[in-house]
UniProtKB/Swiss-Prot annotation:
Involved in the binding of tRNA to the ribosomes. It comes from Wolbachia sp. subsp. Drosophila simulans (strain wRi). This is Small ribosomal subunit protein uS10. It comes from the Bacteria. InterPro entries: Ribosomal_uS10, Ribosomal_uS10_dom, Ribosomal_uS10_dom_sf. Pfam families: Ribosomal_S10 (PF00338). Part of the 30S ribosomal subunit. Gene3D superfamilies: Ribosomal protein S10 domain (3.30.70.600).
Amino acid sequence: MKQDIYINIKAFDCSLLEECVRKFVDELKRSSAKLSGPIALPRKDSKFIVNRSPHVDKKSREQFEMRTSRRLIVLHDLTPTMMQMLTGLSFSAGVEVDLKVKEVKV
């Protein structure tokens, strides 16, 4: 059985996300890995509306927005050296990296 790794990368800042994705792809190409992506996933927008005053002026409100950008990279034919290389990479504080390993029947 083969193993595929799905790498989900999330960030609030788009420039940090692109830098992280570029770093991932460069490291993976250097190790001659078969990969698909980076695939741009839909951006998630969250909006929050709060009252400015705690007691009066219901019409006076503030709006806040939080945008989360996401990318997906799929690695085919996982090797132990690639897994060590992936876990050893470090990224900026605003980037979240999620690794999932799936078994693929051949």
